[in-house]
Each structure stands twice: as structure tokens, then as C-alpha cells.
């Protein structure tokens, strides 16, 4: 496992994000979850979107696990593989009804979005990087544009090239 505390210290030294960088892992079973974890439905009596679980982890320092029973956002549920991909989501009907923009825009965008295989994972796990007790598959950093620029420069310094990214302006979890 990489030295997460050292990575966290380097991020704080060179970028100083306003909230905790997060260790993220998709778990295939509940047995992979750490002993001390907050689950929205079980511990708070709430269903929340994955993006709010990220906010709780990065702002409050909580280790959060979100499974299908916790997920309040149907779009995030599909992206994370917790819910089946429904026709109304593919053609943009559900997004338009939710006030996310015109149906035709989403009909073009939604099929291009990456999504995880339905049923493959049981939980999304998010924890502040410096307290994570698991090996992350991804490190998530919320940052300002200048900080993102610094991270990109650091990534490309040795290898060169460009960093390519894609965004749809929604359903970004």
C-alpha cells in the first residue's frame, strides 16, 4: 500500500487544498468496509447522493460508505452501477424532468458517459486520505483552478504530453 500520509503531506505542502483529499475505493462486498465507517441509511436514517458523502468525508473527516440502499440520486446510482440503466435515463427524459436541461442534450451526452457495471460493487467508500485504512483505487482532490494547474504540471513534468479530460456538466460522480 502506498504511504497515504506522505502523499497527503505532499499535497498539503504543494497545493494546500481547502478540504481533505479523499481516498476512494469501490468495494465488491460489505466485508471490505472498515470497522469504523458511517453509512447514511444505517447511521443517519438518510438516503444521500454520493456527492454528499464525498462532502461529508472531505469537510468533516468522516469515513463514508454508500451502497444502493443509501443512494438518493438515481443518476449517480446508475453511474456507480448500483441501479440498472433505464430507458428514460438514456433518452434524457428523466434529466429533463429533474430540471437538468433539455432532453435532446442528455440524449447526446448520456450514452457517452462512463459507468460501472451494474451489480459489480456493493459500496462506494470515501475517507480522508490521511486517515484511510484501505488502499485507494483513486485519490480525489477538490481544488481551485490554480491548484489543479499545479497538480497537472506535477503529473506531466517527467513524462510530458497533455492531460485529457471529459465532462458533461452533470452526473459527474
Can you describe what each PLM-predicted range is?
Residues 5-173:
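Acidic, serine/proline-rich low-complexity intrinsically disordered regions
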Amino acid at each position: 500500500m502506498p504511504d497515504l500520509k506522505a502523499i497527503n503531506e505532499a499535497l498539503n505542502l504543494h497545493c494546500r487544498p481547502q478540504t481533505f483529499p479523499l481516498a476512494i475505493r469501490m468495494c465488491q462486498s460489505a466485508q471490505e468496509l472498515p470497522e469504523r465507517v458511517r453509512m447514511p441509511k444505517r447511521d443517519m436514517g438518510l438516503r444521500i447522493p454520493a456527492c454528499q458523502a464525498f462532502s461529508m468525508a472531505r469537510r468533516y473527516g468522516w469515513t463514508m460508505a454508500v451502497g444502493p440502499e443509501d443512494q438518493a440520486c438515481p443518476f449517480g446510482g446508475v453511474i456507480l452501477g448500483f441501479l440498472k440503466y433505464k430507458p428514460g435515463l438514456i433518452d434524457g427524459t428523466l434529466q429533463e424532468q429533474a430540471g437538468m436541461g433539455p432532453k435532446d442534450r442528455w440524449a447526446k451526452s448520456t450514452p457517452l458517459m462512463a459507468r460501472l457495471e451494474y451489480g459489480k460493487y456493493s459500496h462506494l467508500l470515501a475517507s480522508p486520505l490521511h486517515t484511510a485504512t484501505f488502499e485507494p483505487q483513486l485519490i480525489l482532490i477538490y481544488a481551485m483552478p490554480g491548484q489543479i494547474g499545479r497538480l497537472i504540471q506535477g503529473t506531466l513534468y517527467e513524462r510530458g504530453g497533455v492531460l485529457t479530460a471529459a465532462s458533461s456538466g452533470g452526473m459527474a460522480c
